[in-house]
UniProtKB/Swiss-Prot annotation:
Forms a heterodimer with SMC2. Component of the condensin complex, which contains the SMC2 and SMC4 heterodimer, and three non SMC subunits that probably regulate the complex: BRRN1/CAPH, CNAP1/CAPD2 and CAPG. One of its GO terms (biological process) is positive regulation of chromosome separation. It comes from Homo sapiens (Human). Belongs to the SMC family. SMC4 subfamily. It is found in: Nucleus; Cytoplasm; Chromosome. This is Structural maintenance of chromosomes protein 4. Keywords: Acetylation, ATP-binding, Cell cycle, Cell division, Chromosome, Coiled coil, Cytoplasm, DNA condensation, Mitosis, Nucleotide-binding, Nucleus, Phosphoprotein. One of its GO terms (molecular function) is ATP hydrolysis activity. It comes from the Eukaryota.
Length: 1288
């Protein structure tokens, strides 16, 4: 926070937030980093940011938003928090040498002292460590912070250490320090105005210090932990909202604390992007509407042209059927001749001999394969048997280890029991000597007490003699009774001693039997537990053995089903992929169909009608070229629009037809005149291996290639004009060159091209394949259905995979449980047998140790007799003693002040005498029973040692057995490995034999094929077959001339091939010929514009392109708009949630501090808190509501403190430093604030500088600051401790 006279640091932390120090940790004026997201302060930077468009994707923008900051600490009881233990100042400001300030209390510490003594230097020292600039510590530069006085001059540096630790609060002032949580942060300033930071003695940068303190909850960003002198009332006086981008009001202050301020910048970015996308979308929408209007205008002519092409296609189909019918009839005749040839079969002796040899070789190889398979099966069986042996040995190993574990545990228990028995032996041996010492010591003490009793009785008698006149009668009666009581006392003591001795003898006599009964009870309980465990595990094994086969069977079925489903999924995915490619190819084919103009359309119509045969079509439509060369060939080849015909005569007929119909003019290429170019079409050597355009053209009919050479000649294509220039002007020859951009260099040297538009689209990139739009729609529907089915299969597969995983897990768990329970059954059986034996032994021991009934009865009768005797004597003595006490009490009441003290001494001595008598009796009983107990303990030692030897032998035997099992297992593993090593060689031999067998089979098949070929080579039928084949060839040629027109976006339809059944159904081919004539007549009557199809298609493609662009930008706009709305809602929700918590706590705090006032944070605009900001309104007690600016100094202070404590409730900070926050408060309010700090904020450490006694008197720790000889010193006291000792 700033010093006096400045704006409050909580309201202006952006301006005061210091930049980080240099990377090496040394700087001339280091200070904290400003909070993230608020680093740009100059206006120019803000303007630049607003002008530049953020082109990041929506995902990148959303991912760049940091998450809400986690709380560094909580208000929960028992939660750890940070506290300052003490501060060490070394030559800092007024502190010379090393001065320790503290220790500070975990809750409430007050710093007091006279003005000018250096109180504020305590906070300056903390600001110095926390990285504030020298100006913020009331100094011009860092070197001024070094102490300088008459006694201490020329000091080169000053250092401040702030020591921290993390604690967990307990009741009262107590707390628990979290282990290894202590650390300290120090900063050293030197004379050259540089400073360095250390954390626990290690040199660090300020960034490291800041991260460490922030991680422990110290709010360096908002400085809420620091309120300096004179600024407390200004915290609540912030404006509702900052007036500029870099100003901060109450709204921005709360936003940063709540954490929703991180969303402000992304919201601005998304808002700007939505505005820009709306503008772009409007442009795209206008383009769509324009293209749609143009497309609709062409639809009528397009439909007429399609009808014409459909009729022509029907003519071609019927011609195709007639030709196929003739081919089918000829093929039937050829098939009949082939049947005759097959009947003629020559015996081939050589082939049969070879076949017999191969058959014998196959038998031999089959025998070798069977022998090898026997070896392979034998080794495999051996490996499996060894694996089963290893599994059995592994189970035995588990059982032996369980037994060994039990025996080892038993040995340890016996060792402990032996140690205890030996200790008892030593104890019983020492009992007689100890008891005699006790008797001697007690007797000596008893004698001394008797003497002391006589003295005290004499003193009592003397006192009573002095009071004889007043109590003479009572005294005589009391003396008489006391004499009588003394006679009874000796009898009571003797009777009690006899009774105690008799009772001890009875207890000792019965102790061994009672111990045996206790051991038997424990053993029976262990036996019951072992039996129940064994029963449960056997039941579990039966249950698992029943469920495991079912689970395995279900798992196998599900795995097979999953495998089948996986294969089905793969097939469907492949099918969908192939179908998708076909659909895309069909759509592309429809989009690439070109229309023809009126002239070309009319010429093609004549061709279809048969009136002018020999017409091929437009040259550009008869070939294809890569899209890369589209501009080049469209620019340099004007002949692409020429019409190709068979001969010049046909070309002349076409010219005459155009003249008669007055349709227009056209240029024709006659193929009969193109043969002269055949020799020049071969590949040639070109400069720089530049490609020749002619070589790049693809054609369906090779006759057309001559026409393309006529049109292109040796024109070369270059990447750019520079290359074209180099290639065109060669020394020995000039070339005609065209660039990819359409620029042409002629052989004469002239150059053409350039301009704003280029020519393209006169030749397609692929040969046209006709397909209908209906077929495309069917393919798309099929693709959609197959995709849905693939998705369903995928979902079924996921569910099945989950079921298989669960079944595998269940199977594995059952197998492990079965193996573990099976291995433990034997151990439990042995344990049950052992416990049965132990119970029997203990039952025998109980019987053996059973006391003699007569002796027990005799001892019990002795105890009863002595007790009766004691009760009778005690009753008589009790009556006398009661009478003595009555008389004594009567006398005491009369002479209470004079006799009470003396009587108390006498009573105390009597009590000690009774204790001595009891001790002597117990010691005598112990001496009598020591020998008997010693013998029992020694017997127990011998039994335990024998059991230990037996157990050790059992451990050795089990260890040897375990070693033997391990050796057997190692041998089994060795044999298995040896067998597995030999397995690959035999497998390889087996594979080689199978391969040889396969070769023999292939040779045999080849021999059979040769035999069949020889049989078919009969010359007597070849002449007839050749004649029919010649006719078939003719009709095939006629079919090859037929091609269907591509119509709209339908897939290009291939000429259909009729099945034999369809061809058999044709009875009269002449009727089809008549139908063809009728269709041709209809076509001749129509006058369509075939170019309308291409024009309509172009407009439709453009329309779909524009619609796709519009959909794309609409989707993008909607995505950004939705993200914008979501972020605004998230920001509002986060802010209002924190706002309600803070304002409710503020109201509660203010009411408590003012004893009846009211305060709240109000939304200036209730619909949008971010538009006008937050207003702080206050109603002091017994006053009306007022704005914060209209309050007195004390009222502002209370309001600010209420807000500070409300923010602490919402976002706790472990430390608070406050400098004279009570300066503007009266006596009453100071007490209220002090009491509130003491009682309500128990989860934070408050260090307050105060001169008000009703503030610092209530604190838990006082830090006194005073100055002598220009040096500040300190002393820490605990006011409550001083008050409890009565020192103040």
């Amino acid at each position: 926070m700033p010093r006096k006279g400045t704006q409050p640091s909580t309201a202006r932390r952006r301006e005061e937030g210091p930049p980080p120090p240099s990377p090496d940790g040394a700087s001339s004026d280091a200070e904290p980093e400003p909070p993230s997201g608020r680093t740009e302060s100059p206006a120019t930077a803000a303007e630049t940011a607003s002008e530049e468009l953020d082109n990041r994707s929506l995902e990148e923008i959303l991912n760049s938003i940091p998450p809400p900051p986690p709380p560094a600490m909580t208000n929960e009881a028992g939660a750890p928090r940070l506290m300052i233990t003490h501060i060490v100042n070394q030559n800092f400001k007024s502190y010379a040498g090393e001065k320790i300030l503290g220790p500070f209390h975990k809750r409430f510490s007050c710093i007091i002292g006279p003005n000018g003594s250096g109180k504020s230097n305590v906070i300056d020292s903390m600001l110095f460590v926390f990285g504030y600039r020298a100006q913020k510590i009331r100094s011009k530069k860092l070197s001024v912070l070094i102490h300088n006085s008459d006694e201490h001059k020329d000091i080169q540096s000053c250092t401040v250490e702030v020591h921290f630790q993390k604690i967990i609060d307990k009741e009262g002032d107590d707390y628990e320090v979290i282990p290894n949580s202590n650390f300290y942060v120090s900063r050293t300033a030197c004379r050259d105005n540089t400073s360095v930071y250390h954390i626990s003695g290690k040199k660090k940068t300020f960034k490291d210090v800041g991260n460490l303190l922030r991680s422990h909850g110290i709010d360096l960003d908002h400085n809420r932990f620091l309120i300096l002198q004179g600024e407390v009332e200004q915290i609540a006086m912030m404006k509702p909202k900052g007036q500029t981008e870099h100003d901060e009001g109450m709204l921005e202050y709360l936003e940063d604390i709540i954490g929703c301020g991180r969303l402000n910048e992304p919201i601005k970015v998304l808002c700007r992007r939505v505005e820009i996308l709306n503008e772009h979308r409007g442009e795209k929408l206008n383009r769509v509407k324009m293209v749609e209007k143009e497309k609709d205008a062409l639809e009528g002519e397009k439909n007429i042209a399609i009808e014409f092409l459909t009729l022509e296609n029907e003519i071609f189909r019927k011609k195709n059927h007639v030709c196929q019918y003739y081919i089918y009839e000829l093929q039937k005749r050829i098939a009949e001749m082939e049947t005759q040839k097959e009947k003629i079969h020559e015996d081939t002796k050589e082939i049969n001999e070879k076949s017999n040899i191969l058959s014998n070789e196959m038998k031999a190889k089959n025998k070798d394969v069977k022998d090898t398979e026997k070896k392979l099966n034998k080794i495999t069986k051996f490996i499996e048997e060894n694996k089963e042996k290893f599994t059995q040995l592994d189970l035995e190993d588990v059982q032996v280890r369980e037994k060994l574990k039990h025996a080892t545990s038993k040995a340890k228990k016996l060792e402990k029991q032996l140690q205890k028995d030996k200790e008892k032996v030593e104890e019983f041996k020492s009992i007689p000597a100890k008891s005699n010492n006790i008797i001697n010591e007690t007797t000596t003490r008893n004698n001394a007490l008797e003497k002391e009793k006589e003295k005290e009785e004499k003193k009592l008698k003397e006192v009573m003699d002095s009071l004889k006149q007043e109590t003479q009668g009572l005294q005589k009666e009391k003396e008489s009774r006391e004499k009588e009581l003394m006679g009874f006392s000796k009898s009571v003591n003797e009777a009690r001693s006899k009774m105690d001795v008799a009772q001890s003898e009875l207890d000792i006599y019965l102790s061994r039997h009672n111990t045996a009964v206790s051991q038997l009870t424990k053993a029976k309980e262990a036996l019951i537990a072992a039996s129940e465990t064994l029963k449960e595990r056997k039941a579990a094994i039966r249950d698992i053995e029943g469920k495991l086969p079912q689970t395995e069977q279900e798992l196998k079925e599900k795995e097979k089903e999953l495998q089948k489903l996986t294969q089905e999924e793969t097939n469907f995915k492949s099918l969908v992929h192939d179908l998708f490619q076909k659909v895309e190819e069909a759509k592309s084919s429809l989009a690439m169909n070109r229309s023809r103009g009126k002239v070309l359309d009319a010429i093609i119509q004549e061709k279809k009608s048969g009136r002018i045969p020999g017409i091929y079509g437009r040259l550009g439509d008869l070939g294809a070229i890569d899209e890369k060369y589209d501009v080049a060939i469209s620019s340099c080849c004007h002949a692409l629009d020429y019409i190709v015909v068979d001969s010049i005569d046909i070309a002349q007929e076409c010219v005459n037809f155009l003249k008669r119909q007055n349709i227009g003019v056209a240029t024709f290429i006659g193929l009969d005149k193109m043969a002269v170019w055949a020799k020049k079409m071969t590949e040639i050597q070109t400069p720089e291996n530049t490609p020749r355009l002619f070589d790049l053209v693809k054609v369906k009919d090779e006759k057309i290639r001559q026409a393309f050479y006529f049109a292109l000649r040796d024109t070369l294509v270059a990447d750019n004009l520079d290359q074209a220039t180099r290639v065109a002007y060669q020394k020995d020859r000039r070339w005609r060159v065209v660039t990819l951009q359409g620029q042409i260099i002629e052989q004469s040297g002239t150059m053409t091209g350039g301009g704003s538009k280029v020519m393209k689209g006169r030749m397609g990139s692929s040969l046209v394949i006709e397909i209908s739009e209906e077929e495309v729609n069917k393919m798309e529907s099929q693709l959609q259905n197959d995709s849905k089915k693939a998705m369903q299969i995928q979902e079924q597969k996921v569910q099945l995979e989950e079921r298989v995983v669960k079944l595998r897990h269940s199977e594995r768990e059952m197998r492990n449980t079965l193996e573990k329970f099976t291995a433990s059954i034997q151990r439990l059986i042995e344990q049950e047998e052992y416990l049965n034996v132990q119970v029997k032994e203990l039952e025998a021991n109980v019987l053996a140790t059973a006391p003699d009934k007569k002796k027990q009865k005799l001892l019990e009768e002795n105890v009863s007799a002595f007790k009766t005797e004691y009760d009778a004597v005690a009753e008589k003595a009790g009556k006398v003693e009661a009478e003595v006490k009555r008389l004594h009490n009567t006398i005491v009441e009369i002479n209470n002040h004079k006799l009470k003290a003396q009587q108390d001494k006498l009573d105390k001595i009597n009590k000690q005498l009774d204790e001595c008598a009891s001790a002597i009796t117990k010691a005598q009983v112990a001496i009598k029973t020591a020998d008997r107990n010693l013998q029992k303990a020694q017997d127990s030692v011998l039994r335990t040692e024998k059991e230990i030897k037996d157990t050790e032998k059992e451990v050795d035997d089990l260890t040897a057995e375990l070693k033997s099992l391990e050796d057997k297992a190692a041998e089994v593993v060795k044999n298995t490995n040896a067998a597995e090593e030999s397995l690959p060689e035999i497998q390889k031999e087996h594979r080689n034999l199978l391969q040889e067998l396969k070769v023999i089979q292939e040779n045999e098949h080849a021999l059979q094929k040769d035999a069949l070929s020889i049989k078919l080579k009969l010359e007597q039928i070849d002449g007839h077959i050749a004649e029919h084949n010649s006719k078939i060839k003719y009709w095939h040629k006629e079919i090859s001339k037929i091609s269907l027109h591509p119509i709209e976006d339908n897939p290009i339809e291939e000429i259909s091939v009729l099945s034999p059944e369809d061809l058999e159904a044709i009875k009269n081919p002449d009727s089809i010929t008549n139908q063809i004539a009728l269709l041709e007549a209809r076509c001749h009557e129509m006058k369509p514009n075939l170019g309308a199809i291409a024009e309509y298609k172009k407009k439709e493609e453009l329309y779909l392109q524009r619609v796709a662009e519009l959909d794309k930008i609409t989707y993008e706009r909607d995505s950004f708009r939705q993200a914008y709305e979501d972020l605004r809602k998230q920001r509002l929700n986060e802010f209002m949630a924190g706002f309600y918590i803070i304002t409710n706590k503020l109201k509660e705090n203010y009411q408590m501090l003012t004893l009846g006032g009211d305060a709240e944070l109000e939304l200036v605009d209730s619909l949008d808190p971010f538009s006008e900001g937050i207003m702080f309104s206050v109603r002091p007690p017994k006053k009306s509501w007022k704005k914060i600016f209209n309050l007195s100094g004390g009222e502002k202070t209370l309001s600010s403190l209420a807000l500070v404590f409300a923010l602490h409730h919402y976002k706790p900070t472990p430390l608070y430093f406050m400098d004279e926050i009570d300066a503007a408060l009266d006596f009453k309010n100071v007490s209220i604030v002090a009491f509130y700090i003491y009682e309500q904020t128990k989860n934070a450490q408050f260090i307050i500088i105060s001169l008000r006694n009703n503030m610092f008197e209530i604190s838990d720790r006082l830090i006194g600051i005073y100055k002598t000889y220009n040096i500040t010193k300190s002393v820490a006291v605990n006011p409550k401790e001083i008050a409890s000792k009565g020192l103040c």
